[in-house]
């Protein structure tokens, strides 16, 4: 995909997500609330490996998914949103993409792996109950 089209496509996708889509916001914020509630309930009802599973799942998700989203991916998205791709040169578009794409994808991979780990830990916990 050419630089102009890449930036435009990402801007459109990000604009839709950041436009306070109620379902997206419910899932994104709700996942944090539910996971914190799960840990709070787990502290009172789980012990040993079960408690460790829920705590590690929460840490993986909160520190490995939510935190990088807030401090890395969203700021990168916002920086890309400021570009007027038709008003800048192809060189500027190329530099913007090179500044954005590798870092965003690296952190997105980290978020995906840690989100999968958190899910796997919670599934293991369910089978142990």
Regions found by a protein language model. Give the residues of each.
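Interfacial loop at the N-terminal end of multi-pass membrane proteins
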Residues: 1-29, 81-101
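Interfacial segments of alpha-helical transmembrane regions
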Residues: 40-64
């Amino acid at each position: 995909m050419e630089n102009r089209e890449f930036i435009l496509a990402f801007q459109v996708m990000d604009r839709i997500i950041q436009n306070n889509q109620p379902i997206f916001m419910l899932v994104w914020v709700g996942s944090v609330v539910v996971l914190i509630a799960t840990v709070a309930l787990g502290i009172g009802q789980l012990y040993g490996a079960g408690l460790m599973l829920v705590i590690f799942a929460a840490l993986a998700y909160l520190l490995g998914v939510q935190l990088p989203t807030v401090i890395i991916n969203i700021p990168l998205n916002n920086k890309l949103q400021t570009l007027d791709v038709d008003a800048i040169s192809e060189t500027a578009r190329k530099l913007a993409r090179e500044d954005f794409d590798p870092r965003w994808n690296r952190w997105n991979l980290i978020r995906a792996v840690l989100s999968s780990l958190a899910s796997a830990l919670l599934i293991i916990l369910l089978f142990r109950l």
